[in-house]
Regions:
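Conserved class I S-adenosyl-L-methionine
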Residues: 23-32
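Conserved SAM-binding strand-loop segment of SAM-dependent methyltransferases
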Residues: 63-76
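A short, conserved alpha-helix within the catalytic core of class I
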Residues: 94-106
């Protein structure tokens, strides 16, 4: 099992959101070893954890607050998830063809919390290939008029390792 702690930024954003909003459903998209899923489930949130790797999912899905699904989100004629969530978390996952699908997972008055690598990360490590790195302010620009951006950061982060990332919190205000 991976022992990396959840992203402090993700944890802080969830705490800010949950102080002011009733949260019933959270989805962790491309969750890997589930560092965010486990953290949130241990805080008694109901979490849906999605990943392509069953072996990774198997390491943490014995938690009663986690429902998991092994899905390849990049190999479907249709988007396999047909639900809405109060919080949608995406960390270190980038498949541009799914931006619209990810946005559509967010309930009205729900939140998208997205953190991933961007151009500039090449000097710090993987990923280095352009197709796995967001362009300048790209994450900020994926939202449409159904969303209000609550927080955006682009720059260096130091934990767990030094990297160059974009981080976004957006609230869905319309369906």
């Amino acid at each position: 099992m991976n022992n990396i702690n959840p992203s402090d930024w993700i944890v802080n954003q969830v705490e800010l959101i949950t102080k002011k909003n009733k949260i019933n459903t959270i989805i962790d998209v491309a969750c890997g070893f589930g560092r965010h899923s486990v953290y949130l489930a241990n805080k008694n949130y109901k979490v849906v954890s999605i990943d392509i790797d069953f072996k990774k999912l198997r390491t943490f899905t014995n938690n009663k607050n986690i429902r998991s699904a092994c899905l390849n989100l990049e190999n479907h004629e249709y988007w396999p998830i047909q639900s809405y969530f109060d919080i949608v978390i995406v960390v270190n996952y980038l498949y541009r063809s799914n931006f619209k699908n990810i946005l559509n997972l967010v309930k009205k008055d729900g939140y998208l919390i997205y953190e991933t690598f961007c151009i500039g990360n090449e000097k710090y490590g993987k990923p280095k290939r352009k197709e796995y790195l967001l362009e300048n302010k790209e994450l900020k620009n994926i939202t449409d008029n159904r969303f209000v951006i609550k927080d955006f950061y682009q720059g260096i982060v130091s934990v767990p390792t030094k990297s160059f990332k974009q981080m976004l919190v957006a609230k869905r205000v319309a369906m």
